[in-house]
C-alpha cells in the first residue's frame, strides 16, 4: 500500500529542497543605491562595525602627504612614523597658498564623491577608553581618627586615638595592659582618654604629642 522510501532517495530529496534556485535568492552586496551600499559597509545600521567602518574623506593635507609620506619613508627607512608626521607637517606649513591650491581642489572632489556614495554618513570620533574604577572601597573612617577597643578583665573599652603620636601612646598602653593589672587601670585609661578628647579640640597635634609624651599614665602599686 505504502512504498518503502529508499534512504538515498530521501537524502537527495532533502538536499534538493534546501538548495535555493539560482538567481532567485542570490545575495548581491553592492547595489545601485548608495544608501544600501553604505549600510552594507557599516554593518546594516549605519554605525561603525570593525573593519567595515567608513573612513572620513581626505583633506588637502592628507592628499598631499599621501605621496610625500611614502617618499620620506623610502629615503629614511629608520625614521619612525611619528617623526615622519612632524616633518610632513612642517613642510606643509612652508608651502605657499598657490602650491596648496591643487590639493584643496582634489580634496573637494573627494568629499563630493564621498557625500554621493554615503549620504547618511556622520563623523563619529572614537571615544577614549575610560580608566577602570577600582573595586576597593574607601574606608568609612578617616585616617586621622581611628577607633579601637581595649580588653581589660574580659571587658571591652573603646579607645580612640589620633595621628602617629597618639598611636604610639596607645601601643604602650596596650603593652602595659597585657600584664595583669588591677581593674582601676581601665578607669585611668578612660579618664585619660576623656582628657585627650577635650584637649584635642583646642590643642594642635604638636601640643597633643607633648602632653602624651610628658604625662604617662599613673598606675598604683
Swiss-Prot record:
Residue ranges, annotated region (Disordered): 24-53, 195-221
InterPro entries per UniProt: HMG_box_dom (IPR009071), HMG_box_dom_sf (IPR036910), SRY (IPR017253), SRY-related_HMG-box_TF-like (IPR050140)
The keyword Cell inner membrane is annotated on this UniProt entry: no
Top-rank taxon, per record: Eukaryota
GO CC, alphabetical: cytoplasm; nuclear speck; nucleus
Function description: Transcriptional regulator that controls a genetic switch in male development. It is necessary and sufficient for initiating male sex determination by directing the development of supporting cell precursors (pre-Sertoli cells) as Sertoli rather than granulosa cells. Involved in different aspects of gene regulation including promoter activation or repression. Binds to the DNA consensus sequence 5'-[AT]AACAA[AT]-3'. SRY HMG box recognizes DNA by partial intercalation in the minor groove and promotes DNA bending. Also involved in pre-mRNA splicing.
Protein name per UniProt: Sex-determining region Y protein
Organism: Cystophora cristata
Taxonomic placement: Eukaryota, Metazoa, Chordata, Craniata, Vertebrata
